[in-house]
């Protein structure tokens, strides 16, 4: 049996249509689950996900300050936690500690129950906010997985076990790509470019998101305007515009403007526009604790807002990034994945992640409804997001950052 495991995290986040996922059909209303709704297990892991998200962001930002950044910390963490079920020793400890968990303070069972609850919550049908996540376990036809690992990834992470002929790398590549393409309604195609011939197992995770603004922009008000990438570079972008009441505050601690824009449903986009020359300060200073204070402050102010249409993506080989967070052994010959299979020693050869973000005017689908907003009779201040800014998409039920990114140049896909 080949002695290599190729692990792919293939993830998608996009403001595009997708129907509700299948996990919600498995979540049954029991007395215990009703009781847990007040203090769900996902809330216990939320602070750790937030810390992991910002740590991962800082590593990516340190690699380059001239490129867009966009990723889903929830999806990456979910895939790593799922993989940890089959690891032992230092390999096991590194993964969970890299996710900001301290096993002396939180039982491992609570960690996995937290992710189980997180996935059930995110995949619950919602007529306003469309969000789903999927996990696929592609297994070499001749590889015998341990029953406990297979049972745990199915019950806790709702992973599909899919027999795969990895001896035919092209056939296996097409099978994985078809799974991702179907799960993302055609948004991502040909994501896996090549597979190593020694691959025996691939973990594939995707997340898909479509949000509708509570208060959409009018397409007729969108005009081409300048966006200042840096002091030497200016690009023309479609700039959306809306006069109205916004959750907008200036934070002296972050030296940034903080704008919250709600989606219909249970999610909010937080945009952080640093004062000129203060991007590095913002990146070094921002914490989820600070952002949580703004999420609780729902005061509004009258603003004439200008915001660029955005269509960006982030594609990452996570191996180097995770090394910076102390997750190294799983990628080495010393990796202990003996909880996955006893057939052969395994190591993770590849960890891929892709996320896509689209921001546009459409807050709702066309419908016979009218929205009237009352605004004071005064000259409002302008607020232009015409230079690089950060974005965090936050889900309220799970208290988790679904996506984190930086828009440096809205015209670069």
Swiss-Prot record:
Subcellular localization, as worded in the UniProt entry: Secreted
Record-linked PROSITE patterns: SERPIN
Q: Which GO terms describe its molecular function?
A: serine-type endopeptidase inhibitor activity
- Mind listing the UniProt keywords for this protein, alphabetically? Glycoprotein, Protease inhibitor, Pyrrolidone carboxylic acid, Secreted, Serine protease inhibitor, Signal
Describe tissue expression.
Expressed in liver.
Which residues, renumbered to this chain, carry the PTM Pyrrolidone carboxylic acid?
25
Q: Which residues are glycosylated?
A: 65, 102, 165, 266
* Region named RCL: 368-387
What GO cellular component is one of the record's annotations?
extracellular space
**Residues annotated as site: Reactive bond:** 377-378
Q: Name the SMART domains for this protein.
A: SERPIN
Signal peptide residues are 1-24
Q: What does this protein do?
A: Protease inhibitor.
Family, according to the entry, reads as follows: Belongs to the serpin family.
Any notes on this protein's domains? The reactive center loop (RCL) extends out from the body of the protein and directs binding to the target protease. The protease cleaves the serpin at the reactive site within the RCL, establishing a covalent linkage between the serpin reactive site and the active site of the protease. The resulting inactive serpin-protease complex is highly stable.
Q: What protein am I looking at?
A: Alpha-1-antitrypsin-like protein CM55-MM
State the organism of origin: Tamias sibiricus
């Amino acid at each position: 049996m080949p002695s290599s495991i190729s692990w792919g995290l293939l993830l998608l986040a996009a403001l595009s249509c997708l129907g509700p996922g299948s996990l919600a059909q498995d979540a049954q209303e029991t007395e215990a689950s009703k009781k847990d709704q007040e203090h769900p297990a996902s809330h216990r892991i939320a602070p750790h996900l937030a810390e992991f998200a910002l740590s991962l962001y800082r590593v990516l930002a340190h690699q380059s300050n001239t490129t867009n950044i966009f990723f889903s910390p929830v999806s990456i963490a979910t895939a790593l936690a799922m993989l940890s079920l089959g690891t032992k020793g230092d390999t096991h400890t590194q993964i969970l500690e890299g996710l900001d968990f301290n096993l002396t303070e939180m039982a491992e069972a609570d960690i996995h129950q937290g992710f189980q609850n997180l996935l059930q919550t995110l995949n619950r049908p919602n007529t306003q906010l469309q969000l789903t996540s999927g996990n696929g376990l592609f297994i070499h036809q001749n590889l015998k997985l341990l029953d406990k690992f297979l049972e745990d990834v199915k019950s806790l992470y709702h992973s599909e076990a899919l027999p795969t002929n990895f001896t035919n790398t092209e056939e296996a590549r097409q099978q994985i790509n078809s799974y991702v393409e179907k799960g993302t309604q055609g948004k991502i195609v040909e994501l896996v470019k090549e597979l190593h011939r020694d691959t025996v197992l691939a973990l594939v995770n995707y997340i898909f998101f479509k949000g509708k603004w509570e208060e959409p922009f009018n397409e007729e008000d969108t005009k081409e305007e300048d966006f200042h990438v840096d002091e030497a570079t200016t690009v023309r972008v479609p700039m959306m515009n809306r006069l109205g009441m916004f959750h907008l505050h200036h934070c002296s601690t972050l030296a940034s403007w903080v704008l919250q824009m709600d989606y219909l449903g249970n999610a909010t986009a937080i945009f952080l526009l640093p004062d000129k020359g203060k991007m590095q300060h913002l990146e070094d200073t921002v914490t989820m604790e600070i952002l949580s204070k703004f999420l609780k402050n729902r005061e509004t102010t009258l603003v004439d807002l200008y915001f660029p249409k955005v269509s960006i993506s982030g594609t990452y080989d996570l191996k180097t990034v995770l090394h910076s967070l102390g997750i190294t052994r799983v990628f080495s010959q010393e990796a202990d994945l003996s909880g996955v299979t006893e057939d052969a020693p395994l190591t993770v050869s590849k960890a891929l992640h892709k996320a896509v973000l689209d921001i546009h005017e459409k807050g709702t689908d066309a419908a016979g409804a009218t929205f009237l907003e009352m605004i004071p009779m005064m000259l409002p201040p302008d607020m232009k997001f015409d230079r690089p800014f950060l974005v965090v998409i936050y889900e309220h039920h799970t208290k988790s950052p679904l996506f984190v990114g930086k828009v440096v140049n809205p015209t670069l896909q």
